[in-house]
């Protein structure tokens, strides 16, 4: 194939329509060097600004020389290049994580929104076979995605439909370690695939076909289940166990960087079935939150360094706090105004719950923890509930319960009213 053929493929696919700046992961191998040649030659036609990024893994004597040559290449092409050196104990997984962390840093620094890699069809076959041997979940056997959105960036693999033999022989660096069978991928490439192709000369096509078929099923299930609210457990549990598993797995596809193992997936299933309330980190910065018949998986929110101090409100004063207007003894007008009988003899304290909090109801003391459980108050609401306190005792849990003190105060000569209005925060 000629370079213009690759350009036409890129334009037809519209890989770069949404992007003005793209970072190319440049290893120096034939595939990435040819991709560099195509992208740098046709920057104008593709309407992109190209930025190069290279990781020197420091595993071969030649790697420092190759780094220098890539710097020269970038200078000749008048393109910026960012380079980082891997350090620490080497493994395939550590190196991959290091590369992608570095690429994201470069993208953040340059304002690029696309990361372009030179993965091709042969890489896809190796990846699917590796995952099959390791016993991965079915959805991952669809292989590497042609386009993949991760957070605010998009990873684009424009060579995924081409084999390495489709690329012309141009200047590149040959990694001699690829001929060694120390790493799993090398054993797949050098040993397992050639043996399997003896049994079926079209084995590579067969593997790619299976991957595409799994992807079709995955997309079809996502489309068919679009109107099912999986986070509603009553709805989820109305289906058979098998359908529940498929729906839950499809729901998890929304979080591409979560990557639960089979054991972790089974644990999530068990929590959804057995726990009434649950909030705990699960993996990769995500947490699982369950509140009775609802659950969600979301990124862990950063916590404030310090808890907000409690608020003290004096008689005949007003204050806006946590989305409410509190008016101590000064009437507020409106249909949605809450009124709580209080005493004007001392100030009112407004705060969130504390360990050991007790509410008096019908002459009986009840711990807030037990009250919340009995009333099935969701954990989020428990943590955000506002406590109104006077004389060292809880007068009211806003919108949830009041105690006998407020009823007694209603008939007291020193009584007044705390007026509360919901306002926009």
Curated annotation (Swiss-Prot):
<dbReference type="GO" id="GO:0006400">
    <property type="term" value="P:tRNA modification"/>
</dbReference>
<keyword id="KW-0436">Ligase</keyword>
<dbReference type="GO" id="GO:0032267">
    <property type="term" value="F:tRNA(Ile)-lysidine synthase activity"/>
</dbReference>
<dbReference type="GO" id="GO:0005737">
    <property type="term" value="C:cytoplasm"/>
</dbReference>
<dbReference type="Pfam" id="PF11734">
    <property type="entry name" value="TilS_C"/>
</dbReference>
<dbReference type="Pfam" id="PF01171">
    <property type="entry name" value="ATP_bind_3"/>
</dbReference>
<dbReference type="InterPro" id="IPR012094">
    <property type="entry name" value="tRNA_Ile_lys_synt"/>
</dbReference>
<dbReference type="GO" id="GO:0005524">
    <property type="term" value="F:ATP binding"/>
</dbReference>
<protein>
    <recommendedName>
        <fullName>tRNA(Ile)-lysidine synthase</fullName>
        <ecNumber>6.3.4.19</ecNumber>
    </recommendedName>
</protein>
<keyword id="KW-0547">Nucleotide-binding</keyword>
<dbReference type="InterPro" id="IPR011063">
    <property type="entry name" value="TilS/TtcA_N"/>
</dbReference>
<comment type="similarity">
    <text>Belongs to the tRNA(Ile)-lysidine synthase family.</text>
</comment>
<keyword id="KW-0067">ATP-binding</keyword>
<keyword id="KW-0819">tRNA processing</keyword>
<comment type="function">
    <text>Ligates lysine onto the cytidine present at position 34 of the AUA codon-specific tRNA(Ile) that contains the anticodon CAU, in an ATP-dependent manner. Cytidine is converted to lysidine, thus changing the amino acid specificity of the tRNA from methionine to isoleucine.</text>
</comment>
<feature type="binding site">
    <location>
        <begin position="27"/>
        <end position="32"/>
    </location>
    <ligand>
        <name>ATP</name>
    </ligand>
</feature>
<dbReference type="InterPro" id="IPR014729">
    <property type="entry name" value="Rossmann-like_a/b/a_fold"/>
</dbReference>
<dbReference type="InterPro" id="IPR012795">
    <property type="entry name" value="tRNA_Ile_lys_synt_N"/>
</dbReference>
<dbReference type="InterPro" id="IPR012796">
    <property type="entry name" value="Lysidine-tRNA-synth_C"/>
</dbReference>
<keyword id="KW-0963">Cytoplasm</keyword>
């Amino acid at each position: 194939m000629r370079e213009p053929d690759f350009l036409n493929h890129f334009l037809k696919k519209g890989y770069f329509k949404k992007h003005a700046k793209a970072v190319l992961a440049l290893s120096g191998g034939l595939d990435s060097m040819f991709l560099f040649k195509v992208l740098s030659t046709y920057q104008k036609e593709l309407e992109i600004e190209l930025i190069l990024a290279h990781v020197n893994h420091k595993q071969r004597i030649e790697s420092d020389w190759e780094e220098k040559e890539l710097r020269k290449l970038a200078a000749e092409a008048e393109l910026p290049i960012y380079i980082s050196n891997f350090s620490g104990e080497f493994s395939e997984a550590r190196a991959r994580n290091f590369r992608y962390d570095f690429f994201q840093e470069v993208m953040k620094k340059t304002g690029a929104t696309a990361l372009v890699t030179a993965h091709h069809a042969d890489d896809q076959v190796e990846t699917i076979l590796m995952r099959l041997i390791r016993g991965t979940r079915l959805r991952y056997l669809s292989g590497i995605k042609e386009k993949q959105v991760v957070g605010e960036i998009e990873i684009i693999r424009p060579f995924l439909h081409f084999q390495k033999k489709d690329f012309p022989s141009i200047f590149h660096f040959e990694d001699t370690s690829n001929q060694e069978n120390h790493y799993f991928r090398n054993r797949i490439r050098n040993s397992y695939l050639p043996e399997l192709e003896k049994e079926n000369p079209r084995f590579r096509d067969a593997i790619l076909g299976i991957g595409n078929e799994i992807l079709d099923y995955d997309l079809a299930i996502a489309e068919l289940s679009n109107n099912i609210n999986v986070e509603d457990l009553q709805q989820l549990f109305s289906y058979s166990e098998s359908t529940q598993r498929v729906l839950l797995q499809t729901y998890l596809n929304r979080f591409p960087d979560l990557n639960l193992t089979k054991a972790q997936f089974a644990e999530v299933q068990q929590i959804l079935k057995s726990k009434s309330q649950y909030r705990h980190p699960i993996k990769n910065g995500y947490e699982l939150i369950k509140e009775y018949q609802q659950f969600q998986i979301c990124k862990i929110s950063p916590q404030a360094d310090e808890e907000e101090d409690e608020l003290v409100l004096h008689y005949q004063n007003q204050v806006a706090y946590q989305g409410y207007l509190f008016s101590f003894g000064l009437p507020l007008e409106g249909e949605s105004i809450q009124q709580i009988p209080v005493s004007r003899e001392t100030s009112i304290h407004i705060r969130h719950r504390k360990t050991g909090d007790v509410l008096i109801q019908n002459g009986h003391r009840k711990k807030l923890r037990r009250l919340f459980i009995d009333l099935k108050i969701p954990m989020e609401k428990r943590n955000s509930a506002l406590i109104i306190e006077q004389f060292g005792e809880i007068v009211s849990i806003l919108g949830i319960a009041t105690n006998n003190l407020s009823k007694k105060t209603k008939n007291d000569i020193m009584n007044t009213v705390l007026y509360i209005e919901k306002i926009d925060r």
